[in-house]
């Protein structure tokens, strides 16, 4: 399995699974999250409003990517309270991404540097 860590415009990356970090209580109205939500046809805010995802450690949302996106799936992982991310919580989030990719039989993962 190919795993890449990227900085910059993560939404333009190509892979089977795109991993995005989210923080507890995060405002989904930031420019980045609005863009992601637009690309994913409103699914991010819909799930957040339903309280299915709050950005807590261990929480995740797996969203099939729409046509035209260079990935098959987007995985949004919770990292907890912003500023409290530790090496261990980042490792757990990365592990969750790899486990998800294995379950889906995916060959490549790209994640933002968190």
Residue ranges and their predicted role:
Residues 1-114:
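Glycine-/small-residue-enriched capping loops at alpha/beta junctions
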